[in-house]
């Protein structure tokens, strides 16, 4: 694997592999990168501190479920690097509004704020966490616009 420097962070150099979608299986605590019908990478993940069920409101500690897209990348994340997920979508916003609440937002795939990953209980506010080495790889492989499907 080749490497490139970016904002003082060493990133793996992109390969010819095109990630066509991301699938998250919350119960299994796994995230899969697909190229067509082939799984090209699999990662152990941590989720929101209250992971059961779909995220409905700001502060509920749940990781969303449903179909979203990767909508941004952040090289200056508190959690090493981060990749934005397009939560909330219009359905999420509508449901929260009906209940008189905010749906929350700023849901990301990210690394940790530690030099290495502590395998611990789910700890994020609703995000999907991987190790810092893994987020460097994911950050370089995944493009803005990539679909992400988050399953229970």
Q: What are these regions, as identified by a protein language model?
A:
Residues 5-53, 152:
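Intrinsically disordered, low-complexity
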Residues 1-3:
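Hydrophobic membrane-insertion alpha-helices, especially the h-region
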Residues 23, 32, 69, 84, ...:
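Short, conserved beta-strand segments within well-ordered enzyme catalytic domains
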Residues 72-152:
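Exported/periplasmic cell-wall-interacting domains
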Residues 32-33, 39-42, 61-62, 100-102, ...:
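Mature, folded catalytic cores of secreted/periplasmic enzymes
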Residues 21, 42-44, 67, 106, ...:
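Well-ordered beta-strand positions in beta-sheet-rich domains
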Residues 9-20, 47-71, 93-95, 112, ...:
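N-terminal post-signal-peptidase region of extra-cytosolic proteins
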Residues 18, 39, 64, 77-79, ...:
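A short, polar/charged loop/turn motif at coil->beta-strand junctions and beta-hairpin connectors
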């Amino acid at each position: 694997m080749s490497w490139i420097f970016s904002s003082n962070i060493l990133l793996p150099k992109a390969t010819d592999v095109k990630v066509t979608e991301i699938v998250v299986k919350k119960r299994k605590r796994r995230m899969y990168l697909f190229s067509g019908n082939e799984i090209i990478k699999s990662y152990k993940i941590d989720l929101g501190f209250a992971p059961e069920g779909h995220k409905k409101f700001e502060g509920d500690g749940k990781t969303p479920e449903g179909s979203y897209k990767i909508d941004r990348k952040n090289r200056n994340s508190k959690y090493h690097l981060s990749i934005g997920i397009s939560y909330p979508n219009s359905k999420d916003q509508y449901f929260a509004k009906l209940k008189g609440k905010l749906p929350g937002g700023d849901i990301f795939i990210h690394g940790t704020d530690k030099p290495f990953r502590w395998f611990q209980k789910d700890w994020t506010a609703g995000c999907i966490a991987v190790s810092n080495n893994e987020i460097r790889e994911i950050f370089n492989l995944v493009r803005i616009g990539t679909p992400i499907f988050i399953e229970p």
